[in-house]
């Protein structure tokens, strides 16, 4: 028989219960995503400050919208600064479409990432099987779905660009490009990393390898940056032999998308394409200690599982993947990330016959 809790213990139990309810809430994340999808903050900033005006702008029912707005006030994203009139708080202003943090797009349920977050509703399935659940929700694997939906592909590329552009100067500055003539950026998106290298090292040329849906975007970006004469873009598949050899091969935010066996296949293709003395540079989220319980690390790690079957990796994992591809982790450089809320690292891999 369980002892009756003491009166003194009950407040602690109530606090614990409130914490659990808050952590287990599904409605609050969906309220935030709905506000982003409806562009509520943009409409408010444009002058639609009442429920009636917002309902007209968003094609929603006023009585239902009021319920949503009440919860947005309760969680601190909106405030009622005059009777019946609402304004965004400092946190709520992050959901403005033109805010540099781009959080509205990240939370918009019509765009690639927030839409993919619905895969978390089948997390038990992913934990039991170790496989992604995106396909069971949407009928196709993540990248195949993007390939058939140009709108999703464009939103995904845009989201990655706004999240990662701020991080490219640091890895470009962290590596010595003196003896590098050509860089191959594998899965390089619109070419932001290759562009950062080209600006820093004028003697270096580069190739960006990407899927068909991103090639035109990358070419346009590099043309606008005035770098198309030094950085070219080719369509290709990094599971096949790479289109050319290089002194440095970049994998920026690529391997976290893939399970270990596929990550080894990608690394093996990269190793095959290295010029003598060349190096593979892996640019990813930094947490190289085993048994990491960091909240941001574990959240992204689970996201990679349910979206793609991929994973974030500790230093021990990187050593194992490198060895399986005939490589060795030669160096790990921690990178400053003043504008994004997590740390990044640059891992330098060398052929096992020459690495440290």
UniProtKB/Swiss-Prot annotation:
Q: Which SUPFAM superfamilies match?
A: S-adenosyl-L-methionine-dependent methyltransferases (SSF53335), Winged helix' DNA-binding domain (SSF46785)
**GO MF assignments:** methyltransferase activity; O-methyltransferase activity; protein dimerization activity
Q: Please summarize the record's notes on activators and inhibitors of this protein.
A: Strongly inhibited by S-adenosyl-L-homocysteine and weakly by adenine and methionine.
Q: Which InterPro entries match?
A: COMT-like, O_MeTrfase_dom, Plant_O-MeTrfase_dimerisation, SAM-dependent_MTases_sf, WH-like_DNA-bd_sf, WH_DNA-bd_sf
Pathways involved: Antibiotic biosynthesis; daunorubicin biosynthesis; Antibiotic biosynthesis; carminomycin biosynthesis
List UniProt keywords, sorted A-Z. Answer: Antibiotic biosynthesis, Methyltransferase, S-adenosyl-L-methionine, Transferase
A biological process (GO) of this protein is:
daunorubicin biosynthetic process
EC assignment: the record states 2.1.1.292
- Domain of life, per lineage: Bacteria
Q: Where is the signal peptide?
A: none
pH-dependence annotation: Optimum pH is 8 and the values at pH 7.5 and 7.0 result in 60% and 80% decreases in activity, respectively. No pH values above pH 8.0.
Q: Does the keyword Hydrolase apply?
A: no
Q: Which residues bind substrate?
A: 163, 257, 303
Q: How does it assemble?
A: Homodimer and homotetramer in equilibrium.
State the family named in the UniProt similarity comment for this chain. Belongs to the class I-like SAM-binding methyltransferase superfamily. Cation-independent O-methyltransferase family.
What is the annotated role of this protein in its UniProt record?
Answer: Involved in the biosynthesis of the anthracyclines carminomycin and daunorubicin (daunomycin) which are aromatic polyketide antibiotics that exhibit high cytotoxicity and are widely applied in the chemotherapy of a variety of cancers. In vivo, catalyzes the transfer of a methyl group from S-adenosyl-L-methionine to the 4-O-position of carminomycin to form daunorubicin. In vitro, it also methylates the anthracyclines rhodomycin D (10-carbomethoxy-13-deoxycarminomycin), 10-carboxy-13-deoxycarminomycin, 13-deoxy-carminomycin and 13-dihydrocarminomycin at the 4-hydroxyl position.
Q: What is this protein called?
A: Carminomycin 4-O-methyltransferase DauK
The organism of origin for this protein = Streptomyces sp. (strain C5)
Name of the coding gene: dauK
